[in-house]
Amino acid sequence: MSTYFSIITVCLNSEKTLARTIDSIRNQTFRDVEYIVIDGGSTDSTLSIINDNKDIVNIFHSGKDHGIYYAMNKGLSLATGKWIGIINSDDWYEPHTFQTIFDLSKNMNEGVIHGLCRYYKGEKEDKVMGIHHNNLREMAICHPTCFISNSLYQKYGNFNTNFTIAADYDLLLRFYLKGVDFLFLEKILANFTLGGFSSSEFVRIDALNVRRNHNLVSSKTYIAFYLYHSAYRLIHFFTFNKLKTIP
């Protein structure tokens, strides 16, 4: 019999933050969990941290890959749980999260459940917010708060690795446009560290490409947006480098 939850963490040289992520799995009040860690070939003490937590890490794979979404797809291929959550190696769950999702999902055949996220800048709390799924056509929701039925991946596919930063947005938008049931919970489920992989200016361009791929953006709007953000990046680049050269 499969476990109820499969949780996936992708990491690379995450020695400073991974233990906190693992502890957030260990401290859950609901324990029918399969924990999968996919490492991209770390050269720091990340592997030692994983080995020290084999009582929590059920499945572990380490080796070079082609990027974060390839690694996430590897984790999905190994997952046997009915519901799947993906938590980054610098993010962490609230202790009640799995129990909360179980209580809501046990009477659902399949769907996506998501909620509020607490955002941090460094060690300082920045804000708490959640984007309702009805806004998915315009903006992404916080992926670490999402729990998705395994069956939906089987029906509609995994992460599209053509997107380098916003493949999680593409995945959720794909499900939403297919008519999948979403449930938004006004409760903090996860904590997210700003400044990581998905916090750069480049995510806006990739998110625009996602919307264009789903025919949600006209060619005229796409070109205008792309030119604006390309100009913004160039101005920022030259301004920064000019400041660096001032004696």
Which residue stretches match the model-derived regions?
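Conserved nucleotide-sugar donor-binding catalytic segment
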Residues: M129-D206, V210
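Acidic helix N-cap motif at the loop->helix transition within catalytic regions
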Residues: K16-A19, D44-D52, H96
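Cell-envelope/extracellular polymer assembly enzymes that use nucleotide-activated donors
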Residues: T3-S6, E34, D170
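Glycine-rich, basic loop-to-helix element that forms the pyrophosphate-binding segment
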Residues: H61-A79
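Short aromatic/hydrophobic "clamp" motif used to bind/position activated sugar donors
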Residues: I84
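N-proximal low-complexity "stem/linker" segments adjacent to membrane-targeting elements
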Residues: M1-R26
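Conserved donor NDP-sugar-binding/catalytic core segment of glycosyltransferases
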Residues: W92, H96-D126
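A conserved acidic beta->alpha catalytic loop
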Residues: R31, D39-S48, N88-D91
